[in-house]
UniProtKB/Swiss-Prot annotation:
SMART domains: KISc. PROSITE patterns: KINESIN_MOTOR_2. Keywords: ATP-binding, Coiled coil, Microtubule, Motor protein, Nucleotide-binding. This is Kinesin-like protein KIN-12C. Residues 534-546 have a biased composition (Acidic residues). One of its GO terms (biological process) is microtubule-based movement. Residues 1-93, 527-567, 623-668, 1093-1119 are annotated as: Disordered. The gene is KIN12C. SUPFAM superfamilies: P-loop containing nucleoside triphosphate hydrolases (SSF52540). Residues 97-434 form the Kinesin motor domain.
Length: 1129
């Protein structure tokens, strides 16, 4: 290898720059020393023999044969600028499907007969002229263009198209010796030393160097998706209408296969996976060393076969955000066609070899195919023009198929090659008229979904077939047409060897999406929502429609408790104003509850179960239906009068400060927890990102409520003020006060915490609340001072009356005597009371006894707030303390809400972070699995390759052993023969042994041929059997469909016959009924014989004057009557 590298460097040092004009000496040295077909064309071309005169003139001193260097036409601008202009005018996504580029090789000979060597000129950026003939092209590279210019014009668009998913091809066409192979592959020295930027590198090495660089850049600069690339290369040649594998010379005469899945491919062609430029260079050097070359008049080492170098680029991309994956497959094809030789120099003396005939034949077929494809589609007669030769068949996608193709027409500017140059340009002009249909070779999620639907249909058809259902589906997959297509694919794929299976990048779990599971999940969610809506409706109906009283002593209170919760603060004020319209003080005190803890229900409340209603310490000492679950019965909701029901009341109400074991903060925290769940549910369902909890504690002024006993005592103690307070403190009004108080407590009990939809204007509420609070505080203080005096007087009277009542119950005397004693005591202390007042006091005392007995069984577990309402309003400091207590509770609740919100946000952020880490871990795991799968696959291929090498090594070792044994036997035979006189005998013995071996090999070959023939016969019989079975299956399917159609037709005819029979039966029945009706009518209209006889005699008497004519008339009448007599009878 080191010696080869030195020789190649030595040759490269003697060569000139790419396509530069060489001197005669350099041309002579190159013609003598060049032994590589892909060297510089100036060096590889052989100069024509010079005449002696020319030799003398060149040898003369001072003679400079190249002193006057031919100058090309000025119409040709610098090729680099032209290449940049052409590249900018045709972007990758909008590039034309077919392009033609012309490259001119510089001349290596001198003018002959004064003719101009540079007869090719560029007239415009899109046309080239040869004499007076103009040709349309897409690019032009003159004799001064370098390999880098050719790559910029040809290679860069091919790379962009390949990475975009299009198939791209480069076809080099031209005369032998015009530099096609040099333009395509460059010099071998540049391939060996791939690390340096060699000027002689061809288009193919430059393309792959740029391709791998762009692939690496795309993988590093795509954070939103993961992209993996894989490249595999193959190298073949078409020699004498046979396809040979250049990477494995033992693979010869390969066959071309075509199917719907893989398209056009060569059977058993070697594919090598590449990842660097060095891998590609190794493949190129190995393939080019096995290529068929020969000597022509234009080139010492001319290509005598067409070579095709293909690279398949597979790209898999998977997005991180949506998880969708897609795959792209593109193919880059480089075609180096062998050029025809110029016959003008040798004329009839040139010997047309077999290789030359095949080259010309294949190029002729290629020209005919281009002519056919350049015509209009309606004028094309041949349906399969590509199958005329192996070259056109392999290039089916390149020529008129799914590919973007660039034709590089290599021409010579010498006048002796004028005819071949015109032929090459005409070929390029016709090729430019072809219409290729290049599409992006991509498999996306939609294709996978379509295949999933097809698989589902196939499964349904298979299940239907297994179940015995012979009725075919109208839109099923197993129809007669699809069966015919399947049979055709079976025939095409018969006798075909197995192809290496494609590597699945993504697993089935990632790609397969079951639509049935998704639909089932949607149905479950929909049922859950509907059940939640039904539960919510039932809950509201049970709350608003239940009429079970909650207290036996207050029936009116139970009716008012069944009313729905009032969110607005003005409606309860209006109701209280209607109930207590007679007392102005009570109206003012009722207005103190204008603001209480309530949050209006959101109109966008989600269809799920409502949160449990929050209970307030202001609630009355009884249960509420609105704060319990809908499943509780009315018996559980009602409050028992005995103290033993305290446990059930605690579990149902969770309200009163004394009856509940929880503090106000814990009670509110338990209620807020459900509300926070609702807030999180709204945020997850694309609701407002931030919800507001409205907690209104504007005023907590307590309504002073007096007990029934103390109110009654107030009436007795102050008879002079009865007119001022009798309307509010009488027996009937007392019930109204109790009812209203219960209603107010129930209103306060309905304090709820629900999600609010908007922010309440807090500034306005604070100003209004402060104004109302100051006003009510003044009124409350005046009322407290007024009531303080009453309480002091009434308390003494109540104590005395209680003692009297106790003495009356314990004494054995009569009731009137004790009442008189009580009256005497009262008269002593209050002498101003008269007799009427005493009677009224006695009646009030009796009523108080009854009420005391009734209240004795009630629960004494009354909250501090209830005590304050029932008579402790005289103590102003207790009112202030209660207000401060609730303000502190409010601040604690607000702080607790904020803390819960902060904790919720932190927990949500932690959950999102954890979910992100989990997704990253899953992605890393998937990447590792993919890498492991690829590594396993590559290791398997390495093991298989190693096993093949081991088998080959064992075979070679066995052959070597046999050869050494044969050599040893020959040596022994020679030793036995001696030195003199035995040479003839030894030769005869050796010839006999060789003939014996030859005979054995012939026998073995004959046996193998016979075995091969039998196997072919069996294979043909098997193929025929498979064909027959497939045809039988198709015919059975068609017959089944025909029988099904006939059954349907017969069923339709049977139905029609049944309808006709039913109609006939109906007509028969109708006819019979009509006949019966007619007979009935005839029977009703029958006349007696006497009537008929009288009528006959009357007619005979009326006509006596007629003789003959009358007689005939009478006979006719008689016959007529005789005919109808039977009908009348």
């Amino acid at each position: 290898m080191e010696m080869l590298r030195r020789n190649l460097k030595r040759q490269a040092s003697r060569s000139l720059s790419a396509f530069a004009v060489s001197s005669p000496r350099a041309g002579a040295v190159a013609a003598a020393d060049a032994d590589q077909e892909n060297l510089h064309p100036n060096l590889a071309a052989a100069s024509p023999p010079m005449s002696p005169a020319a030799k003398n003139s060149s040898a003369a001193p001072g003679a400079s044969p190249r002193s006057s260097k031919p100058v090309p036409t000025s119409a040709a601008p610098p090729s680099k600028a032209a290449a940049e202009g052409e590249q900018a005018s045709a972007p990758a996504n909008e590039a034309p499907a077919v392009k033609v580029v012309v490259r001119v090789r510089p001349t290596v000979s001198r003018p002959v007969d004064g003719k101009d060597l540079f007869f090719v000129r560029k007239t415009s950026p899109c046309s080239v002229a040869v004499g007076d003939r103009s040709f349309a092209v897409d690019g032009f590279l003159d004799d001064r263009a370098s390999q880098a210019d050719a790559f910029d014009l040809i290679g860069v668009p091919m790379i962009e198209s390949a990475l975009a998913g299009f198939n791209s091809s480069l076809v080099c066409y031209g005369q032998s010796g015009t530099g096609k192979t040099y333009t395509m592959f460059g010099a071998l020295a540049a391939m060996v030393d791939s690390s340096s930027d060699h000027a002689d590198r061809g288009v193919v090495p430059r393309v792959f160097q740029n391709l791998f660089a762009q692939i690496q850049g795309r993988q590093e600069s795509s954070p939103e998706k993961q992209t993996s690339y894989q490249c595999r290369c193959s190298f073949l040649e078409v020699h004498n209408e046979q396809i040979n594998d250049l990477l494995d010379p033992s693979q010869r005469n390969l066959q071309i296969r075509e199917n719907a899945g893989n398209g056009i491919h060569v059977e058993n062609l070697t594919d090598e996976y590449v990842s660097t430029v060095e891998d590609v260079n190794q493949i190129l050097m190995k393939g080019l060393s096995n290529r068929k070359v020969g000597t022509t008049s234009m080139n010492l080492k001319s290509s005598r076969s067409h070579v095709i170098f293909s690279c398949v680029i597979e790209a898999w991309s998977k997005g991180f955000s949506n998880g969708f994956s897609s795959s792209r497959t593109s193919r880059i094809t480089f075609v180096d066609l062998a050029g025809p030789d110029n016959d003008e120099l040798d004329g009839g003396n040139k010997h047309c070899t077999r290789e030359e005939r095949y080259v010309k034949k294949s190029l002729s077929k290629l020209g005919k195919l281009v002519n056919i494809l350049s015509e209009a589609p309606e004028t094309q007669k041949d349906d399969s023009p590509h199958k005329q030769s192996c070259l056109t068949h392999v290039l089916k996608d390149t020529l008129g198929g799914n590919s973007r193709v660039t034709f590089l027409c290599s021409i010579s500017s010498e006048h002796r090659c004028r005819t071949t140059t015109l032929s090459t340009l005409r070929f390029g002009e016709r090729a430019k008229l072809m219409s290729n249909k290049a599409v992006v070779n991509e498999i996306s999620e939609d294709d996978v979904n379509g295949l999933s639907d097809q698989i589902r249909q196939l499964k349904d058809e298979l299940i239907r077939t297994k179940s015995g259902d012979t009725e075919p589906c109208k839109n099923g997959y197993f129809s007669a047409q699809n069966a015919r297509e399947s049979l055709h694919n079976l025939r095409v794929s018969l006798n075909r060897s197995l192809i290496l299976p494609h590597i699945e990048v993504d697993s089935e779990e990632e790609m397969d999406v079951d639509e049935e599971d998704v639909q089932e999940l949607r149905d479950q969610i929909r049922k859950l929502h509907s059940s939640s809506e039904d539960t919510f409706d039932d809950f509201m109906d049970a709350e608003s429609g239940d009429d079970t009283p909650c207290s036996k002593g207050n029936p009116k209170t139970s009716e008012e408790d069944d009313q729905p919760v009032i969110d607005d603060c003005e409606d309860p004020i209006q109701e209280e104003h209607e109930v207590l319209s007679s007392t102005k003080v009570d109206q003012d005190l009722v207005s103190d509850r204008k603001s209480f803890l309530s949050v209006s229900a959101s109109p966008h409340l989600s269809p799920m179960q409502d949160p449990t209603l929050c209970s307030s310490p202001k609630i009355h000492n009884k249960a509420r239906k609105s704060i319990t679950s809908p499943g509780l019965s009315p018996s559980k909701l009602s409050v028992s009068d005995c103290p033993g029901d305290e446990v059930s009341r605690k579990s149902a109400v969770r309200s009163s400060l004394q009856s509940s074991k929880l503090s106000p903060t814990d009670s509110l925290a338990a209620s807020l927890q459900r509300g926070l769940h609702i807030m999180e549910y709204h945020e997850q369902n694309q609701g407002p990102r931030k919800s507001f909890v409205g907690l209104s504690f504007d005023h907590f002024a307590l309504n002073p409520r007096q007990s029934v006993a103390k109110v009654s005592s107030g009436v007795l103690a102050s008879p002079e003020r009865k007119g001022a307070t009798s309307s509010a403190l009488c027996s009937s009004c007392k019930k109204a006060i109790d009812t209203d108080g219960n209603q107010k407590d129930n209103i306060n009990a309905e304090k709820q915490i629900v999600i609010a939809t908007s922010v309440v204007p807090e500034v306005k509420d604070d100003i209004t609340a402060s104004t109302i609070a100051s006003k009510r505080q003044t009124e409350l203080e005046a009322l407290c001072e007024e009531q303080a005096d009453k309480i002091k007087e009434l308390s003494n009277l109540v104590d005395q009356y209680k003692k009297c009542s106790e003495d009356a119950q314990n004494s054995d005397g009569t009731e009137p005597t004790k009442e008189l004693v009580d009256e005497a005591k009262v008269g002593e202390q209050h002498g101003e009371l008269n007799v009427n007042d005493r009677e009224e006091l006695l009646s009030e005392i009796q009523r108080l006894k009854d009420q005391l007995k009734q209240q004795a069984g009630e629960s004494t577990n009354v909250s501090l707030l209830e005590h304050l309402r029932n008579g402790s309003t005289d103590q102003e400091y207790e009112l202030d303390r209660e207000r401060e207590k609730w303000m502190e509770s409010e601040s604690k609740w607000i702080c607790l809400t904020e803390e819960l919100r902060v904790d919720l946000e932190s927990n949500r952020m932690l959950a999102e972070k954890t979910e992100m880490e989990l997704s990253n871990e899953k992605k890393c795991t998937a990447e590792l699995d993919d890498a492991l799968q690829r590594a396993i696959y590559g290791h398997a291929r390495i093991i298989e390759h190693y096993a093949e090498l081991q088998e080959m090594y064992n075979d070679l070792l066995e052959r070597h052993r046999r050869v050494m044994e044969g050599i040893s036997e020959v040596k022994r035979a020679a030793a036995k023969a001696g030195r003199k006189g035995c040479g003839t005998a030894f030769a005869a013995a050796l010839a006999a042994e060789l003939s014996t071996v030859r005979i054995d090999r012939e026998k073995e070959r004959a046996q193998l041929k016979e075995q091969n023939r039998r196997l072919r016969i069996q294979l043909r019989d098997t193929a025929e059997a498979v064909h027959a079975a497939g045809e039988l299956l198709v015919r059975l399917r068609e017959a089944e469909e025909a029988s099904t159609q006939e059954k349907e037709r017969s069923a339709a005819m049977q139905q029609e016959n049944d309808k006709l029979k039913k109609q006939l039966e109906k007509m028969k029945k109708k006819h019979e009924m009509e006949m019966e009706t007619m007979k009935h009518f005839l029977a009703d209209s029958r006349l007696p014989e006497s009537a008929l006889g009288g009528f006959y005699r009357q007619e005979s008497e009326d006509v006596p004057e007629y003789n003959n004519h009358a007689t005939s008339t009478c006979d006719d009448d008689q016959s007529w009557r005789a005919a109808f007599t039977s009908a009348y009878e």
